[in-house]
A protein has these predicted regions:
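FIC/Doc superfamily catalytic core
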Residues: 1-195
């Protein structure tokens, strides 16, 4: 596999992860993007058919990633085995995901925050954990939308009404809002997800 250029804010693959590309005919980033998008469309169809409700667990989080990227990457659905430019040490990922799911249940039961705020916190935390080798932003956005619809009974977020996997103003604002959330300021992310 060739070296691909990554958009600003994307997590580069290490050589072992890059070797997990199942489609060896892919030579450009645009080809990779097309194949991944096709796989994500299949995952969306699977979600529409299955209407999952038991989603706050490691098994579902991993299954969703596998459905989104499993036709393209060998490691799809497997937690990362290397440290990245974001997220804690790779060996802490399973416990971090479990803690996130437990915390999300607690946030729901406490009813101290509006459902959108709970979903924003969930999304930010999942992105911060960065559980997979790649595809974390797309996975976290889709996982948050499933959380909104299946658990919180709210409509999906609009995510700036743009394709956030592509460079541009919306992606820049999204990443800036995530950085603000890192500092415990969720206002920009709350605004962004419903624009």
């Amino acid at each position: 596999m060739r070296e691909f250029q990554y958009p600003v804010g994307a997590t580069p693959l290490d050589p072992d992860e890059a070797a997990g590309l199942l489609l060896t005919h892919i030579t450009t980033r645009s080809e990779l993007d097309r194949w991944e998008q096709g796989n994500i469309i299949e995952a969306l169809a699977w979600l529409d058919q299955t209407k999952p409700s038991d989603i706050l667990n490691e098994q579902f989080i991993r299954a969703l990633h596998r459905r989104m990227f499993g036709r393209v990457w060998k490691w799809a659905g497997d937690f990362r085995q290397s440290d990245k430019n974001i997220g804690g040490p790779w060996h802490q990922v399973p416990m971090s995901v479990k803690n996130l799911c437990d915390d999300a249940r607690l946030w729901i039961n406490l009813r101290e925050e509006e459902p959108d705020q709970v979903a924003v916190r969930f999304h930010h935390r999942l992105v911060s954990i960065h559980p997979f080798a790649n595809g974390n932003g797309r996975h976290a956005r889709l996982m948050t939308d499933v959380f909104l619809e299946a658990v919180l009974k709210r409509p999906k977020f609009t995510w700036g009404s743009a394709d956030l996997s592509k460079p541009g103003d919306a992606r820049h604002r999204y990443i800036a809002a995530l950085h603000e959330a890192d500092q415990n300021n969720y206002v920009p992310l709350n605004k962004f997800v419903r624009t």
